[in-house]
């Protein structure tokens, strides 16, 4: 049994392909999970889909052709050619998959290193897979350990100090383009997490925001949470507002562009459109008075951010390395601990049964029972010492040997019970 990760990110896949790979809604997520898990070699699986990445994390029986199967599943549902996806995909196995997962959770693999949005996105992907019964104890272990690793990095480094998300990078670029945002008004299209982040960063820089969303109630709720510097407008008036103001940020979950040349008419003032959605929201003709920036266009500011955080990132990567090693050490202990407990429990049961027989037959005086029980305990403890040491030193891939020991001693039931308890205790956050 092994961990495997198939990864498509801003590093290996451009935005045009990424938006085709997007599994943004529950129907698509459910469909890809069902298709991937129909392969019997794949025991557990989750899919993380954001504007900058699509990640498949799986716990599998066998590596042979499994990654190809996952890529074929993604190809089938996205319509992107298999060979193109295979060439682009980053595939990680065993400790490489865990190291990658920990790096993703800790925002070291993000477009903007140190942003904390990924933690919530990973939790959502995990909870969705769990609700769909596609995630079990092994992914529970991996995800919970990844979240703990991310927490350690946030507490021990400044990697997330003044956290920067893609939305805040867009606002930074807006400031570079027009200067002080104080007193300006920006149009924000959408009312989801990314739109909310854009609004918050704009308001932090003293701008006012007009929120436009198809669902007016969602827009109203967001505006109320932001205070007096936020207002709303009807989605039917979108064209009016994008032709009136210089700053437009769009972050909806639409399947196709909602701002096109039909809406965005030429104006006599400079406008800046920030498309922070995947798939893209904006498809207009650029000219001297209108500039459009998509997610991939934010990389220049991202590179500046990387330089500022490079030292902290190196510290964080060393923590990821240590936590990965610790994870596999704990996993090895988890493999051996249940069989050791089952053996000891079996020996204790046999000893207690024989002790009761001896008492019943009058072989022992009542005054000697406690001493006899202590003696028996010392005997089976001494007898099991060497097997215990050897079990703890078994290779981490020796699960078949452990299962055989349980079968030979007839302790499968106790072994399964202790396995379940061990995993449940380990998964407590």
UniProtKB/Swiss-Prot annotation:
Taxonomic placement: Bacteria, Pseudomonadati, Campylobacterota, Epsilonproteobacteria, Campylobacterales
Notes concerning its domains: Possesses an unusual extended V-shaped dimeric structure with each monomer consisting of three distinct domains arranged along a curved 'spinal' alpha-helix. The N-terminal catalytic domain specifically recognizes the glutamate moiety of the substrate. The second domain is the NADPH-binding domain, and the third C-terminal domain is responsible for dimerization.
Role description: Catalyzes the NADPH-dependent reduction of glutamyl-tRNA(Glu) to glutamate 1-semialdehyde (GSA).
Pfam family, one: Shikimate_DH
Gene3D superfamilies: Glutamyl-tRNA reductase, N-terminal domain (3.30.460.30), NAD(P)-binding Rossmann-like Domain (3.40.50.720)
Miscellaneous notes: During catalysis, the active site Cys acts as a nucleophile attacking the alpha-carbonyl group of tRNA-bound glutamate with the formation of a thioester intermediate between enzyme and glutamate, and the concomitant release of tRNA(Glu). The thioester intermediate is finally reduced by direct hydride transfer from NADPH, to form the product GSA.
Enzyme Commission no: 1.2.1.70
Complex formation: Homodimer.
Site annotation Important for activity: residues: 100
Sites where the protein binds substrate: 50-53, 110, 115-117, 121
Keyword terms: NADP, Oxidoreductase, Porphyrin biosynthesis
Reaction(s) this enzyme catalyzes, per UniProt: (S)-4-amino-5-oxopentanoate + tRNA(Glu) + NADP(+) = L-glutamyl-tRNA(Glu) + NADPH + H(+)
Single annotated GO MF: NADP binding
Record: residues binding NADP(+): 190-195
Enzyme class: oxidoreductase
Residue numbers annotated as active site: 51 (nucleophile)
Similarity section: Belongs to the glutamyl-tRNA reductase family.
A GO BP annotation: protoporphyrinogen IX biosynthetic process from glutamate
Organism: Campylobacter hominis (strain ATCC BAA-381 / DSM 21671 / CCUG 45161 / LMG 19568 / NCTC 13146 / CH001A)
Involved pathway(s): Porphyrin-containing compound metabolism; protoporphyrin-IX biosynthesis; 5-aminolevulinate from L-glutamyl-tRNA(Glu): step 1/2
CDD domains, sorted: NAD_bind_Glutamyl_tRNA_reduct
Coiled-coil regions listed in the entry: none
InterPro entries: 4pyrrol_synth_GluRdtase, 4pyrrol_synth_GluRdtase_dimer, 4pyrrol_synth_GluRdtase_N, GluRdtase_CS, GluRdtase_dimer_dom_sf, GluRdtase_N_sf, NAD(P)-bd_dom_sf, Shikm_DH/Glu-tRNA_Rdtase
Protein name: Glutamyl-tRNA reductase
């Amino acid at each position: 049994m092994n961990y495997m990760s198939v990864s498509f990110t801003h590093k290996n896949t451009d935005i045009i392909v990424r938006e085709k790979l997007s599994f943004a809604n529950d129907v698509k997520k459910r469909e890809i999970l069902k298709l991937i898990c129909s392969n019997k070699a794949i025991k557990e699986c989750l899919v993380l889909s954001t504007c900058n990445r699509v990640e498949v994390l799986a716990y599998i029986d066998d590596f042979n052709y499994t990654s190809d199967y996952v890529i074929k599943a993604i190809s089938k549902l996205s319509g992107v050619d298999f060979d193109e996806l295979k060439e682009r995909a980053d595939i990680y196995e065993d400790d490489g998959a865990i190291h990658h997962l920990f790096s993703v959770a800790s925002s070291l693999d993000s477009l903007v290193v140190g942003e904390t949005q990924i933690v919530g996105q990973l939790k959502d992907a995990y909870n969705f897979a769990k609700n769909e019964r596609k995630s079990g104890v092994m992914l529970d272990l991996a995800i919970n350990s990844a979240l703990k690793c991310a927490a350690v990095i946030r507490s021990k480094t400044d990697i997330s100090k003044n956290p920067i998300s893609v939305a805040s990078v867009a606002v930074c670029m807006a400031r570079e383009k027009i200067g002080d945002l104080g007193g300006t008004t920006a149009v924000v299209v959408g009312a989801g997490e990314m739109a909310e982040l854009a609004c918050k960063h704009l308001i932090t820089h003293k701008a006012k925001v007009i929120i436009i969303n198809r669902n007016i109630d969602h827009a109203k709720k967001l505006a109320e949470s932001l205070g007096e510097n936020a207002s709303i407008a009807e989605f039917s008036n979108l064209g009016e507002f994008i032709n009136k103001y210089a700053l437009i940020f769009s972050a909806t979950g639409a399947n196709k562009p909602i701002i096109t040349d039909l809406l965005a008419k030429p104006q006599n003032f400079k406008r800046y459109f920030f498309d922070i959605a995947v798939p893209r929201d904006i498809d207009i003709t650029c000219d001297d008075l209108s500039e459009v920036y998509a997610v991939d266009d934010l990389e220049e500011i991202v590179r500046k951010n990387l330089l500022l955080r490079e030292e902290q990132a190196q510290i964080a990567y060393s923590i990821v390395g240590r936590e990965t090693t610790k994870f596999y050490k704990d996993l090895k202990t988890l493999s051996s601990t249940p069989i050791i407990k089952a053996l000891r429990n079996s020996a204790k049961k046999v000893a207690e049964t024989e002790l009761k027989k001896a008492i019943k037959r009058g072989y022992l005086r009542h005054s000697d029972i406690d001493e006899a029980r202590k003696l028996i305990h010392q005997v089976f403890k001494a007898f099991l010492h060497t097997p215990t040491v050897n079990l703890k030193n078994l290779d981490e891939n020796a699960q078949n040997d452990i299962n055989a020991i349980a079968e030979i001693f007839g302790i499968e039931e106790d072994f399964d019970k202790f396995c379940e308890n061990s995993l449940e205790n380990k998964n407590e956050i």
